[in-house]
């Protein structure tokens, strides 16, 4: 990153995962005037770990939960804020799942000079590769999928996790592929 990107700015980071936390903490370190993480559910429902959330808050990141971005607000071609729908928690899609959120009909505009999108991902369907109900790829102990010579690891298998876990899974999958080739 370039320090001038964040320095002196009111930064909003949209997202609730560890990537969003990393982006927010980076903005704090790069001397942003304020950094607020905007998430559509409650703090407890964030996919980011409790440890990551605690560290971010200790470093000065503010959390604005139960807010879902609706539109950017600007003046003379310059961003001035983000209008958010105020949300309320609703039942999860499945037992043990994170709660969903629905708009209350109210809105709030958060001031911002810079907005960072740190939103999740969705696995793309791959022909013949079996997935679980959460669309995570099902693998064997050797990282093999249901398609011969196709291997998977990282977030595509576990869902959102840490960078280090994804790197470790990549190394393990590479070792399994190498073992199969030899």
Where do the PLM segments sit?
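FAD-site-proximal beta/loop scaffold in flavoenzymes
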Residues: 1-8, 93-160
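Rossmann-like NAD(P)H-binding beta-loop-alpha module
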Residues: 2-32
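Redox-cofactor binding/interface segments in oxidoreductases and associated redox assembly factors
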Residues: 13-14, 84, 117
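Cofactor-binding loop segments of dinucleotide-utilizing enzymes, especially the Rossmann-like FAD-
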Residues: 16, 39-42, 155
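A conserved FAD-binding loop/helix module that cradles the flavin
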Residues: 23, 156-182
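Rossmann-like dinucleotide-binding cores of NAD(P)H-dependent redox enzymes
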Residues: 24-71
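A conserved short coil-to-beta-strand element within the FAD-binding core of flavoproteins
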Residues: 66-78, 87-90
